[in-house]
Every structure is written in structure tokens, then in C-alpha cells.
A protein has these predicted regions:
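P-loop NTPase motor domains
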Residues: 180-183, 192-195, 202-205, 211-545
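Accessory regions of macromolecular translocation/handling assemblies
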Residues: 1-229, 233-252, 315, 346, ...
């Protein structure tokens, strides 16, 4: 957009020697000479004063444009990082005119003038620009030191300080003159609803992406909206700023800390707790498998195995966990078969009759022994031909599968399962039924969002990249399931269930108000990107999810 004062016939070249300031200095020097001559009586004092006044007039005429040009060229040197206190930040955001805006910092709008200035800069040699910028920075550092009283009291320390500042100026990264082509830096606001289409933030290492994240996170917290922060590298500053923002609102209890590198301080979180259909669980796990050429049969078989176990657990009204899946993938299938068939008998016959049938079928044979399992299978296939379950049929097919072949087909799956279901991650990601009853220690993503919590998730990928990436992918998939429920059900209740699996599904669905905007911040997104994450980016807007990547 062209400015109101833009003149297409006016040409300005600001990146040149400052002739105006030089002229002003010459005119002022000449005026001093005339004043000196007037003082010593070299010529007529009146004439000398008139000449001095003329020289001063010319000097002041050139001084203003010279100073403006000096200031403009000085901006090419860049500026030190600016900071704002949380109190001042809240006052800034409290402006009624920007109640529905997002503050993105200070800067200027690009117009024809700025584009022309940048074009002229690009036409110059970059080394020349760097030399000019460093030289100008030296002059400014020297002027600042001269103004300070302690410079004259401690000249040696002042010289050391000068050398240190000059060295820092030479080490600055990037191209600071890009930000210097604008005239004035003012507060820049973006309509908040523009963020509904998600926001991509990119820049080189150390360019300030994470600190910009801090600004956006603090604003989301101050708006009282739920915030999910996924931080693969575990930035302490990001966690601290989020915690301080909660403290400023007197909502310290709303801050939830999850970090796989600090299990002693972390809450427990089950990344398989939210789903609308049980096969989503298998899809989350199989998404972690390597997608190499020729791996499709192994991936498909692994998906089928996980899905079968998850369906069986759900039929038993047991919440699927990573350790539960690991337990039955490694063996103990007899135990799962007995649990599943017992649950099915109770659903079809009632508690009392099912217990009586179990006693008749098993007698004194242990239920989990090979003979006991065989007896239950025979009864199921012979006596319950009209009341069979697809879940049990799939489970029996897997149970009777050749164990050697089964182990080979899930070779790529087991390392992934071991990564996220052993050691300290076992308790963090697979809480027991007892732990899940502890609402302080165990938290659920749907409950966290419903309570508008601020959830910091540190993945510690610097220590173990593969484990951190796997955990991050699972958590993002869990978030995608929460968002997906907003598409399917919105604020309404789930349709009446038709069987026990549907009933259990209803109990796992989020029951928060989907009109609430959920802010998801994913730093270093390449570490955790997967198919559910792409789906969340593609369709999350309809569920009021805002992603900042």
C-alpha cells in the first residue's frame, strides 16, 4: 500500500556518505572561526557576528537532514534485544482497541519506500555494508562511553568494555540492516482469527523462534485458553515463562508439567486414552514404524496385532496402555483370551449364568492353562455359534497363529514398544488403574483441555531422539483424536451405544466445550511430525484447534 506522502518523482539514496552532516560541521566550524575573530578584534566585531550568524544558519539548515540520515544509517547496525516485563505486557494487551488481536512485536509495514531502500542496499557489496555497520557501531559505543561518568573515573575498564562491545558487534549473526530500512518501529498486531488457519514460524538457529513462541504462549495463557506446549529439546525458558504467566493470573494449579527426562517432577499421561474408534490405537502405534520399501507387510501385520489386542482389552472394559500392549505382544495370550471370553460370556448370559458355565467347562482345570483355554474355545465355537464376537474371533486367530512366524512379523514393532513401555516411561505413559484414580498424579488430555490447563510437554530429544520423537508423535495423535471428536459430536452427546465396546468408547470421548479454542505450540516440529499431526494441521481448524509450528 502506497503511503499518503509518497512522491514517485522524488529519488532518495540514503546509503551514501553523509554529506549533509559533513556540510553542517564545516559551516559550524566556520562560524566558530568568525566568532573567534570577532572576539580578538581581528576584523569588525559586527561584521564577524553577521558572518557567523549566516554560517550558523547554513549549519542548522544541513544539521537536521544530516542527523536524520545518520539515525537512518545507524539503524542498519541493528539493535540489541528488547525485553518487556509481564506487567507491562499485560497492560499492552489490555488495550480495548486490540482486545481481539495478537501482538507479534514491534516493526514497520513494508511499502514502496522500504522496498526501494532494501533494493538499493542489495545493490551494494555485503562486505562494505558489514564494514560500515561495524564502524558505525564503534562510533556509537564510543559516544555512549563518553557520556558515562565512570568512563572518566576508570578509563582502563572503559577501554575493556569498549573492546568487548566491538567484538560482540562483529559476531552478530544475520543481516541486521533488513530491520533498519524502516522508519519507525511500532506495535504490530494481527487479528486473532487469522491464527485459526495455523501459524508457521521459521528461522535459522538462534534467530529467536523460541522467544517468539514465548510471546504467543503468554498471550494464549492470559486469554484463559487451554495451551499445549510440545517442546522436543526441553527449553527451560519456555517452561518458566509459561509458569510465570499462570502465576500472574493466580492459576498456578493450571500449569501441568510433563517431561520424560524428569519423571520425579512429571505428571503421568496416557497417550492412548482418547479415541473414537479402537482401530485408532493401532494406527498410532503403526505410525511409529519405519516406512521403508518392503515394510508394508510387517506394518500391516503389526497394525492387525495391536488392533486385535486393543479391541480385546476394550471388550474387557480395560483402558489400553502401552505396557498392556507390550505384555500381550510378548506372550501371555492365554490370560487375555480367558479375560476376553469371560467378559463376553457375562455380556451375553449375565453374571450368574456365566460363572456357572465357567465352572462346568473348566472343572478343576486352571483357566489360563493350555487345557483350560482349549476348553473355553471349544465351548465358544460349539455352544455359542449364534452369539460370537468378531473381536474374539480375531483374538483366537492370533492366539492360534504360529508363534515363530508371529514373532518375525512384529520384529519392527517390538523395539518401538520397548522404547515407550519400559524403564521410567512405563509409569509415565502407562499408568495403572490405581494411578489413574489419582487425579493429581495422572492427567488426561481431554480433562486438561476441559479445565483450560497449560500443559508443558518436554521430550528430551537431546538425550534420546528416537524415544522423544516416539512419545511426541503419540501425544500429537492423542490430540488429533480429541480434535476429531469435535468434528463428530461437537457439544452434543455421543449417540446411544449399541454394545459394550460402544459404551466404553463413549466413556473415553472428550466432553468439553468444543467452542473453546485450543492452542497447540509445537517447537522443532520435524522431531515429532507424523500422519496424525498432518491431519491436525489440515482439519484442526474445524475443531477450534490453533497450531503454532
Amino acid at each position: 500500500m502506497l503511503g499518503m506522502q509518497y512522491d514517485p518523482f522524488e529519488y532518495e539514496m540514503p546509503w551514501r556518505p553523509n554529506y549533509e552532516l559533513r556540510c553542517a560541521l564545516v559551516w559550524f566550524a566556520t562560524a566558530l572561526i568568525y566568532l573567534f575573530w570577532a572576539a580578538i578584534g581581528f576584523f569588525s566585531a559586527g561584521v564577524m557576528l553577521w558572518f557567523a550568524a549566516i554560517m550558523l544558519a547554513f549549519g542548522f539548515y544541513y544539521l537536521r537532514p544530516g542527523l536524520l540520515l545518520w539515525e537512518k544509517q545507524g539503524r542498519l547496525v541493528g539493535a540489541p534485544p528488547s525485553f518487556i516485563t509481564l506487567k507491562a505486557f499485560r497492560e499492552l494487551l489490555g488495550d480495548p482497541a486490540h482486545r481481539n488481536d495478537l501482538w507479534i512485536g514491534e516493526g514497520f509495514e513494508w511499502s514502496v519506500s522500504e522496498i526501494q531502500a532494501l533494493t538499493q542496499l542489495n545493490a551494494r557489496d555485503e562486505k562494505e555494508l558489514i564494514t560500515m555497520a561495524v564502524a558505525d557501531r564503534k562510533r556509537r559505543i564510543a559516544l555512549d562511553l563518553i557520556k558515562r561518568k565512570d568512563t572518566w573515573l576508570h578509563p582502563k575498564q572503559a577501554l575493556k568494555h569498549y573492546a568487548l562491545k566491538v567484538a560482540e558487534a562483529k559476531r552478530e549473526m544475520g543481516s541486521p540492516w533488513i530491520h533498519g530500512v524502516g522508519e519507525d518501529n511500532v506495535n504490530q498486531w494481527m487479528p486473532l482469527n487469522h491464527a485459526d488457519g495455523h501459524t508457521l514460524i521459521f528461522g535459522t538457529t538462534g534467530a529467536g523462534k523460541t522467544r517468539f513462541f514465548d510471546l504467543l504462549i503468554s498471550q494464549a495463557i492470559l486469554r484463559g485458553e487451554p495451551v499445549i506446549i510440545i517442546d522436543p529439546k526441553g527449553d527451560e525458558g519456555m517452561e518458566k515463562n509459561a509458569r510465570e504467566a499462570c502465576k500472574a493470573l493466580n492459576r498456578e494449579d493450571a500449569f501441568v508439567y510433563f517431561h520424560i527426562g524428569h519423571p520425579e517432577k512429571s505428571v503421568h499421561l496416557n497417550p492412548l486414552s482418547n479415541w473414537a474408534s479402537a482401530d485408532e490405537i493401532a494406527s498410532r502405534i503403526s505410525a511409529l514404524l519405519p516406512q521403508d520399501s518392503g515394510s508394508a507387510p510387517f506394518t500391516g501385520f503389526s497394525w492387525l496385532a495391536v488392533n486385535t489386542i486393543a479391541q480385546a482389552l476394550i471388550l474387557c472394559n480395560i483402558s489400553p496402555t502401552l505396557t498392556g500392549l507390550k505384555q500381550y505382544l510378548e506372550g501371555n495370550m492365554e490370560q487375555l483370551v480367558v479375560k476376553t471370553m469371560t467378559a463376553w460370556f457375562k455380556q451375553q448370559m449375565g453374571q450368574e449364568k456365566a460363572d456357572r458355565v465357567m465352572r462346568q467347562v473348566l472343572g478343576h482345570i486352571p483357566a489360563t492353562s493350555s487345557k483350560g483355554v482349549a476348553a473355553l474355545i471349544d465351548f465358544y465355537r460349539v455352544k455359542m455359534t449364534d452369539k460370537q464376537s468378531d473381536v474374539i474371533n480375531s483374538l483366537l486367530s492370533m492366539y492360534e497363529h504360529d508363534s515363530t512366524h508371529f514373532s518375525k512379523m512384529i520384529t519392527s514393532l517390538m523395539p518401538i514398544i520397548h522404547q515407550v513401555a519400559t524403564s521410567h516411561l512405563k509409569d509415565l505413559l502407562s499408568p495403572s488403574e490405581e494411578a489413574q484414580s489419582d487425579k493429581v498424579l495422572f492427567r488426561d488430555m481431554q480433562e486438561l483441555i476441559a479445565n483450560r490447563c497449560v500443559v508443558y510437554i518436554g521430550l528430551d530429544t537431546m538425550s534420546n531422539a528416537s524415544v522423544g520423537a516416539a512419545v511426541g508423535s503419540l501425544i500429537l495423535a492423542d490430540l488429533t483424536a480429541v480434535a476429531g471428536s469435535g468434528y463428530k459430536f461437537g457439544k452434543s452427546q455421543v449417540p446411544s451405544p449399541g454394545n459394550a465396546v460402544e459404551d466404553f468408547r463413549e466413556s473415553r470421548l472428550p466432553k468439553f466445550d468444543h467452542s473453546t479454542h485450543v492452542n497447540v505450540f509445537v517447537d522443532e516440529a520435524n522431531e515429532v511430525a507424523n500422519n496424525p499431526f498432518i491431519q491436525l494441521l489440515n482439519k484442526g481448524r474445524g475443531a477450534n484447534f490453533r497450531l503454532f509450528v
